[in-house]
């Protein structure tokens, strides 16, 4: 069973980001999205979700971090709304960890091996 995990930190005040909605959707060949899970980070800014899906072939997913819930638009100009990763999974046992450091003006992330 594949697992998606994350740890989200707020670069503006150095805290863990709790209650941030993270949604994983499967992008189907017809362009439609099927939500696999939608969960919130815990008090420590962490989320870990395992899910069941047929991964006999590569599948494309979108992992969305709903940053706009944390930082409502306050200023004129460009603000970071939501962060979306498009990822490919093809292993039933894959663990995919994405740490994210966010602010209202951007984000920094990387894929971390476990």
Language model segments and positions:
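Compositionally biased low-complexity segments at domain edges in trafficked proteins
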Residues: 93-114
């Amino acid at each position: 069973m594949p697992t998606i995990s994350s740890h989200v930190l707020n670069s503006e005040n150095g805290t863990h980001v709790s209650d941030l909605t993270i949604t994983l959707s499967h992008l189907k060949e017809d362009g439609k999205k099927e939500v696999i899970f939608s969960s919130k980070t815990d008090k420590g800014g962490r989320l870990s979700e395992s899910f069941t899906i047929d991964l006999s072939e590569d599948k494309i997913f979108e992992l969305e971090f709903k940053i706009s819930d944390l930082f409502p638009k306050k200023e004129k100009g460009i603000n970071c709304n939501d962060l979306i990763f498009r990822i490919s999974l093809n292993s039933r046992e894959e663990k995919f960890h994405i740490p994210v450091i966010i602010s209202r003006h951007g984000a920094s992330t990387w894929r971390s091996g476990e």
